[in-house]
Amino acid sequence: MAKPLTITSSHSHFSLAWRAYFEMTKPKVVALMLLTVLVGMCLAVPTAVPVQPLIAGMFGIALMAGSAAALNHLIDRRIDGMMARTYNRPLPKGRVSAKRALIFAASIGGLGFVVLYVLVNPLTAWLTFASLIGYALVYTAYLKRATSQNIVIGGLAGAMPPLLGWTAVTNQFHGHALLLVIIIFTWTPPHFWALAIHRRAEYAKVDIPMLPVTHGVEFTKTCILLYTVLLAIACLLPVLVGMCGPMYFVCSSLLSSVFIYKAWQLKYRDHDGLAMQVFRFSIYHLMLLFMALLIDHYLWS
């Protein structure tokens, strides 16, 4: 009777460990990021994306993005344990040790780099590596604790995925790919500032100088509103250069109008929970916008 119990116990331990490591990769964030990678790939070519860069590119970029997320967990483990939103993460709870987290991040990051370098192209491998360093080290380890403009400057690393998808297929830069980067770069501040308003007290408690902590909630609301207007303009750039057609134009205009309206509400008609509503809508905004880009591309082409 002891043997089956031992096997069951081992299986249960493995399952819990696997879930902890998987959680460290921030799968929901990576999934949204991979959508923007896929759109970058598809917009780079007029027909179907070649199979090898599609599969190897998505796999390699996903591994390196997961590595960056795991490093973020590792670096932020102290403050994560003090914040209600993050105290249940694997490192603060002791489900994964710091040493094992580092080994895990290095392993999947290294594997992802090799996959991209060998099976895709060196340009994409190095760009993805630069994004990993930008997010995990420049943003998480330095900017996040150094300046209230942390998310503005550090947002560039998180805006790179469409370019990575583009270079994975073409092995070269293109202005159209940079327009997609601009969209995500402009989207990032209002997305995170809305969350920062909701979690202002927690960020202040752990000495993270998010904009609502250093400049106040009202100033942050104004910045969110201004950035949603800038984002609406950025979202029209693909139309202005002939990259997209009427279907994307209509979807983009509708999504931007709703985002601006919600930001206006946050500034002038705020109520409990509205900041989190803006935060959640921003996720749907980006997801639906890039889906519209993808659908329009095949309709327009």
Curated annotation (Swiss-Prot):
It comes from the Bacteria. It is found in: Cell inner membrane. Keywords: Cell inner membrane, Cell membrane, Heme biosynthesis, Membrane, Transferase, Transmembrane, Transmembrane helix. The keyword Protein biosynthesis does not apply. CDD domains: PT_UbiA_Cox10. GO terms for molecular function: protoheme IX farnesyltransferase activity. Its EC number is 2.5.1.141. It catalyses: heme b + (2E,6E)-farnesyl diphosphate + H2O = Fe(II)-heme o + diphosphate. GO terms for cellular component: plasma membrane. InterPro entries: Protohaem_IX_farnesylTrfase, UbiA_prenyltransferase, UbiA_prenylTrfase_CS, UbiA_sf. It is a multi-pass membrane protein. The chain crosses the membrane at residues 29-49, 51-71, 101-121, 123-143, 150-170, 177-197, 223-243, 244-264, 281-301. GO terms for biological process: heme O biosynthetic process. Pathway: Porphyrin-containing compound metabolism; heme O biosynthesis; heme O from protoheme: step 1/1. Carbon 2 of the heme B porphyrin ring is defined according to the Fischer nomenclature. Belongs to the UbiA prenyltransferase family. Protoheme IX farnesyltransferase subfamily. Converts heme B (protoheme IX) to heme O by substitution of the vinyl group on carbon 2 of heme B porphyrin ring with a hydroxyethyl farnesyl side group. This is Protoheme IX farnesyltransferase 2. It comes from Shewanella sp. (strain W3-18-1).
